[in-house]
């Protein structure tokens, strides 16, 4: 069965056609990206095709939520005292307050989001405020946006960004995240390293967009063929000019929202106005 042509362009020299690429790999698995890509299945667990191995280690279990993945970044890159400082200051969603009467810290939620009752986290005589305790009782209560704010504000040599992508059916939505360390940026990018967080974020936003296109099936293969001209000569002496197509590029893959966008990218390389 012949493939369906989604879009095409033809002139005296080339024929360019765009097809769906049904079996494309995730772009983060195809080529090196500046960011470490994190996205999930419909059940909220990390997707097998995201870069969970970079975050957790190749022998780890990737069956965790996005919030748990972001918390891993907190423990790796945010100093403990900065964590407490951030929690004390609070955000629009919560605030950590000291209850003088009960002599313990209490986690106060915005009742419009969490309900009116405070959640007791740890008492003043609990000197062993180790990471596991804080992980279960504190960071789990935060919104993902709060955790990202914490990392970007106090994380050492790391930047995190996110992008919300939408599918083609009602309710198709995916909030995808990416992070990059200063060390990784220096290895991946040859441009000047000043203001590296801003530059890394710009790279990662584009990379997340490509991963989102893959997630929703917006992947296209562009085939370029050159017209090779020749002359047919018949026994009766007649001549007829004809041509045949010769492959130039048979499988250039594009992760983009519209197939015409893929066509225009290739036309820039082959068609001179």
Regions found by a protein language model. Give the residues of each.
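Acidic interaction surfaces
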Residues: 1-273
């Amino acid at each position: 069965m012949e493939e369906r042509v989604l879009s095409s362009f033809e002139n005296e020299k080339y024929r360019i056609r765009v097809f769906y690429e049904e079996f494309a790999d995730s772009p983060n698995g195809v080529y090196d990206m500046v960011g470490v890509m994190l996205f999930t299945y419909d059940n909220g667990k990390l997707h097998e095709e995201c870069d969970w191995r970079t975050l957790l280690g190749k022998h780890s279990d990737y069956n965790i939520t996005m919030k748990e993945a972001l918390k891993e970044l907190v423990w790796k890159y945010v100093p403990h005292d900065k964590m407490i400082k951030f929690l004390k200051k609070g955000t629009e969603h919560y605030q950590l307050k000291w209850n003088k009467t009960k002599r313990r810290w209490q986690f106060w939620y915005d009742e419009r989001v969490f309900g009116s009752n405070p959640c007791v986290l740890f008492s003043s005589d609990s000197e062993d405020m180790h990471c596991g305790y804080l992980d279960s009782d504190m960071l789990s209560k935060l919104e993902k946006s709060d955790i990202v704010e914490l990392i970007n504000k106090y994380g050492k040599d790391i930047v995190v960004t996110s992008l919300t992508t939408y599918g083609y059916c009602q309710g198709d939505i995916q909030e995808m995240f990416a992070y990059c360390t200063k060390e990784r940026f220096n290895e991946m990018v040859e441009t000047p390293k000043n203001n590296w967080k801003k530059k890394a974020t710009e790279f990662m936003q584009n990379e997340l967009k490509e991963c989102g296109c893959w997630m929703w099936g917006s992947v296209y293969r562009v085939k370029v063929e050159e017209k090779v001209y020749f002359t047919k000569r018949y026994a009766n002496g007649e001549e007829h000019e004809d041509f045949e197509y010769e492959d130039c590029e048979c499988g250039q893959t594009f992760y983009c929202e519209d197939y015409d966008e893929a066509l225009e990218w290739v036309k820039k390389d082959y068609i001179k106005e």
